[in-house]
């Protein structure tokens, strides 16, 4: 049952990521250009996913919610491989400032937001 829930959740997460990525490419390009050509949609997706995952862990819900939201939706929503591919592209284009900023904001920002989500959930 959890296997099926995770699969359904992953489909939902992937569709959300697709929609947000396309929306972000049209409407958030100015943000990325202002900050060394950062891939803003991927950064937004991964940081919000980290926050939500921390929150889900913090509310101590049942295993079905973990399967559908934590593993499924957020597994399909967030993207580690795209982020790293974008980091390589920033490096190859000699955009070292963008590379460092994107790496730090993705890895460190994601870790911080997991903790923020977790501790906010504990308050509720």
UniProtKB/Swiss-Prot annotation:
Example of a GO biological process term? cellular detoxification of fluoride
Highest taxon listed in the record's lineage: Bacteria
Lipid bilayer topology: Multi-pass membrane protein
Q: How is its activity regulated?
A: Na(+) is not transported, but it plays an essential structural role and its presence is essential for fluoride channel function.
Q: From the UniProt record, list the reaction(s) this protein catalyses.
A: fluoride(in) = fluoride(out)
Q: Which locations, inside or outside the cell, does it occupy?
A: Cell membrane
This protein's UniProt keywords: Cell membrane, Ion channel, Ion transport, Membrane, Metal-binding, Sodium, Transmembrane, Transmembrane helix, Transport
Q: Which GO terms describe its molecular function?
A: fluoride channel activity; metal ion binding
Any transmembrane segments, and where?
A: 1-21, 36-58, 63-85, 104-124
Pfam families xref list? CRCB
List the GO cellular component terms: plasma membrane
Residues annotated as binding Na(+): 75, 78
| InterPro entries on file | FluC
Ubl conjugation: is it a keyword of this entry? Answer: no
HAMAP family associated with the record: FluC (MF_00454)
What the entry lists under PANTHER family is as follows:
FLUORIDE EXPORT PROTEIN 1-RELATED, FLUORIDE-SPECIFIC ION CHANNEL FLUC 2
In which family does this protein belong, per the annotation?
Answer: Belongs to the fluoride channel Fluc/FEX (TC 1.A.43) family.
Q: What does this protein do?
A: Fluoride-specific ion channel. Important for reducing fluoride concentration in the cell, thus reducing its toxicity.
| Oligomeric form and interacting partners | Heterodimer composed of FluC1 and FluC2. Neither FluC1 nor FluC2 alone catalyzes fluoride efflux from liposomes.
The name this protein goes by in its record: Fluoride-specific ion channel FluC 2
Taxonomic lineage: Bacteria, Bacillati, Bacillota, Bacilli, Lactobacillales
């Amino acid at each position: 049952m959890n296997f099926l829930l995770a699969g359904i959740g992953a489909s939902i997460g992937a569709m959300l990521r697709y929609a947000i990525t396309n929306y972000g490419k049209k409407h958030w390009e100015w943000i990325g250009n202002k900050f060394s050509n950062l891939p803003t949609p991927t950064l937004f997706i991964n940081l919000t996913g980290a926050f939500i995952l921390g929150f889900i862990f913090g509310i101590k819900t049942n295993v079905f919610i973990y399967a559908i939201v934590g593993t499924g939706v957020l597994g399909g929503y967030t993207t580690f491989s795209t982020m790293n591919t974008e980091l390589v592209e920033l490096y190859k284009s000699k955009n070292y400032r963008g590379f460092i900023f994107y790496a730090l904001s993705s890895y460190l920002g994601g870790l911080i937001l997991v903790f923020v989500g977790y501790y906010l959930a504990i308050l509720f």
